[in-house]
Amino acid sequence: MTKHNEQEIDRRRTFAIISHPDAGKTTITEKLLLFGGAIQQAGEVRARKAARHATSDWMEMEKQRGISVTSSVMKFTYRNYEVNLLDTPGHNDFSEDTYRVLTAVDSALMVIDAVKGVESQTIKLLDVCRLRHTPIMTFVNKLDREGRDPFELIDEIEKVLKIQCAPMTWPIGMGKRFRGTYHLYTKELIIFDAEAERGTGSIVSLSGLDDPRLDEILGSQAAELRGDIELLEGAAHPFEEEAYLAGLQTPVFFGSAINTFGVQQLLDTFVENAPAPLPREAVTRTVSPYEEPFAAFAFKIQANMDPAHRDRIAFFRICSGKFTRGMKVRHVRLGREVAINNATIFMAQDRTHVDEAFPGDIIGIHNHGTIKIGDTFTMGEELKFTGIPNFAPEHFRKVRLLDPLKSKALEKGLTQLAEEGTTQVFRPLMGADWIVGAVGILQFDVVMHRLEHEYNVKATYEPAAYATARWVTGEKKKLEEFQKKEVMSCYIDGEGNLAYLASSQWRLDNTMDNWKDLQFHATREHS
């Protein structure tokens, strides 16, 4: 690989933001884009009811509800680093899609609400990051409101999320008494001013905590700060880059995203310390980003990003080599050679054609139904990247068509939406009712809305008497026997795999006991 290409890889930072709904993820996303020059004006959360909606929330239903339902990709440049930010669905129902986004990043930013502390969605997402040893930085948001004691928050993060905290900045007061933060490593006092552009009144470089200017600026709050820092030095962990990169320690910043305060300090540390593109595990070997041959995997399919064109785009994470427009690659699953002429990069709704891209970059490739989640593009090697699963759904609905003449359109719509991976579809071995399965119930609303607006299909749901699903594999003869005996509970999923839908956990356990020669899987790697 050329020196130039190596430098390009080292400049890349690819990450996602994880948080509980309403912790401020959309706001901090926009402020990062603002610093990166990718947008000129932040679509403030408070202005959501007006015509301007958050740049990263572009689907119609998201605009109506003020939540991020889809995951989009945004690219910006900051201090000569190329940053790829993958926006994850913020609503707690969208964990499956969020999980797959986390397979495509090298690090994550965790946003914690200073008022509410650690919440359930954050715990789930951090568990996913922990499986992959993903390095995590933390931003404690909403310091401009009356929140919880920062020591209490640090303690909660360590105990609940089981990760060491290394405070990088420390708040001076909060709510009405919020004066700013003190940077423990640069010894800078960052003054908060809600009226100032980007929330920062001034940054004062101090010789240390005994600098007399501290008292001049902060008055009685200077003594509070000195007391806090003294406590921290005894109790908190100092920042260790090795522990951070291993996913064992999280550097913690405090601020107020809506006021753009504290975001720059976070971003500076992020580009300097977050990992460049990391090696990726494939079935046969580990793939280094510095290898010459191109390799990439699809982690997301998004249909109808442009309502005018009814298109579908597959999002690919480049793992090695260099992408150039027009290059021919092997679509491994299909054993077919394809030329990529129309790859795009994203800035929320805006797309631009890409002439070249490097490991860590996310490119979008137009897709007419041939690309599936987990597919690999290579220069010929039979590679299959691991760790991009489907999860067994926990909620099920029967789909009833209101117009019987639309059955073909229904099949097309359900199949395409399932290929995006937020819901799964199951066709019965016996009977006509399609079943939609989802990890979270909000996805059913999304499917109904999109069937009507994108496929012109009106349908209703009826409850389906199922509680869980498992994919079933085993010897051909045994599978045939199983399908005969359990025909009313056997379905074929959107990729042609046999699935068993059970009405209760007891029923599933009982069936598994009766069919010990078969394997029942709660997750399934994309084929």
From Swiss-Prot:
List GO terms (cellular component aspect): cytosol
Q: Which residues cross the membrane?
A: none
Q: What's a Pfam family in this record?
A: RF3_C
- Note whether tRNA processing occurs among the keywords: no
**GO BP term, pick one:** regulation of translational termination
Q: Which residues form the tr-type G domain?
A: 10-278
One example GO MF annotation? translation release factor activity, codon nonspecific
Q: Where does GTP bind?
A: 19-26, 87-91, 141-144
Sorted alphabetically, which keywords does the UniProt record give?
Answer: Cytoplasm, GTP-binding, Nucleotide-binding, Protein biosynthesis
List locations, semicolon-separated.
Cytoplasm
Family, according to the entry, reads as follows: Belongs to the TRAFAC class translation factor GTPase superfamily. Classic translation factor GTPase family. PrfC subfamily.
Q: What does this protein do?
A: Increases the formation of ribosomal termination complexes and stimulates activities of RF-1 and RF-2. It binds guanine nucleotides and has strong preference for UGA stop codons. It may interact directly with the ribosome. The stimulation of RF-1 and RF-2 is significantly reduced by GTP and GDP, but not by GMP.
Its name, as the record gives it, is Peptide chain release factor 3
The organism encoding this protein is Geobacter metallireducens (strain ATCC 53774 / DSM 7210 / GS-15)
What phylogenetic lineage does the species belong to?
A: Bacteria, Pseudomonadati, Thermodesulfobacteriota, Desulfuromonadia, Geobacterales
> What is this protein's gene name?
prfC
